[in-house]
Amino acid sequence: MSSRIGAFMLLIFLFFQILSVSALTNGFDGSALQALKAEWTKPPSNWEGADPCGTSWVGITCSNNRVVSISLGNLNVEGKLSGDIAALSELQILDLSYNTGLTGPLPPNIGELKKLKNLILVGCSFTGQIPQSIGQLEQLIYLSLNLNQFSGTIPASIGRLSKLYWFDIADNQIEGTLPVSNGTSSPGLDMLLETKHFHFGKNKLSGSIPENLFSSNMTLIHVLFDGNQFTGKIPDTLSLVQTLTVLRLDRNKLTGNIPTSLNNLTSLQELYLANNEFTGTLPNLTSLTSLYTLDVSNNTFEPSPIPSWISSLDSLATLRMEGIKLNGSIPNSFFSPAQLQTVILKRNQIDSTLDFGTRFSNQLEFVDLQYNNIDVYKQPSSNTVIQVILADNPVCQEEGNKPNYCSEIPPNTSYSTIPPTCTPCDQGREASPSCRCAHPVIGTLYFRSPSFSGLLNSTNFEILQKSIEDFFKKLSYPVDSVAIRNIRENATDHQLLIDLLVFPLGRESFNESGMSLVNFAFSNQTYKPPHIFGPYVFRANPYNQFSDAGGSSSSNMGIIIGAAVGAVVLLLLLTLAGVYALRQRKRADRATDQNNPFAKWNTSKSSIDAPQLMGAKAFTFEELKKCTENFSEANDVGGGGYGKV
């Protein structure tokens, strides 16, 4: 009996083993994705069935039946991110960027995703405190939470993320001070020795910038603290970070003198100190020979002449010194740096004559000297194209027709890589560079600190367009072409904004799979622009013209495979059942033979047939007495402990 039960249990085990092979998704992972789907009012359209890996759910990547990546950029997903995400124990990438319908706080147990490397939630609508448990994601490399509505403070536990490369929380409502370690049990941002990017701009961070935040062991290249409420002085320890290339401290409430120790940052290319409350005089920064951009506008420096050392900064392209009480005349060599493109000196007390001389940069495009005391302007030769603004200077206060330099002319932002001769498209479509009408991905590239400022030279933008196009083609993305247009500078933070259009390949609109791929290239910073454009963020517009689910063919193939596997399973089960029944029949026959007392009677060697037992027969006492002749001793065959027989 026990052997029959064992065989039956083996059959059940084999059945479930076969079923588990036929489903290509780990059971726990499948349940977790189903729970996520239940939280979303608009999940991807092909998220159907119970086998996300086997039926190729859009945005889901699997390895060995485990979900390792979720990438759903700009797929109009709406709802909340539930704690069920923590069940995906093999997850390495989570990218939900550009889904503005994703709201609510992050789940507190998100730190259970021990293998997570990329957490990318750019441009959603998440709120609340960043969970402390994020500090448990020991494998994390990219942490991009920018362009949301997060509040609260920066978790000190993030200091434990020893592999973190990219840390971006810009454009939120995060407040409080910057956490630093206490040398014993409490972690802090000073422990992030491998991190290259601190992007904290446009928040509500306050207090002083801690002295022990920076050290010579750090490898930071970008420190972007602009648009916060920091107070106090620039810490001298900042100059210990020799790898720094971009420093943005503008639009805070910093005070004191600008430290001369900044001269130690010899790799620095961008220095933004504008719109603070710095005092004293501007220090000599001649050691910053790699500097492209210097912006010290709108501080409370003491009155001083224009620094002569400016002309020694050979790499300087953009100089902004608005409203810092500069006086006297402009030095003859002031415009001589070979890369100089833009000079902003408005709202000062500069007087005398504006004369570019003969040694000015041939890259020079724009000079703004509004609200000064210039009374003479010696214009350069007629073949020189420099836009000069001298409005509200004595030279422009004479009666009569005023020259162009006495008016503020807005910069030309009409540049576009889409030919103006294209026939206008209908139904909300856009013309591609080849004049083909389609529904492109449209968004804006925000370049946070470009190393150039001139908008008149189209070469930089042609290089950018080709760079993006080549990137997509090299990786065989479903992209036909890209276009850029509406180039402008943000007047507040001087970021460079460019509208980007990415056109689908071989169809009128993207499917969901193609959309996910394109957006991940930007959200994950897989695409890297030419060096002169610096750090960037892409913000995609909502997309509502999907051509199909993007995974229907895969789903159909999954159904076909499932049906085929089911048929094989059924056939195998029937075969196993037949084998089992045959073996049971043979066992029954062997048992019958063993219980037959005449089973080995050899009739070939005897003329007498084997006795045929008809069953047990009962005899009465009288019959026994008669047959034994009243129990005569002549019929005695033997004796035993219980009497004679």
Predicted features along the sequence, with ranges:
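Protein kinase glycine-rich loop
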Residues: 634-645
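Cytoplasmic C-terminal tails of single-pass
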Residues: 588-616
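Plant-biased, solvent-exposed loop and capping regions
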Residues: 1-583, 589-595, 609
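A short, low-complexity linker immediately N-terminal to eukaryotic Hanks-type protein kinase catalytic domains
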Residues: 613-634
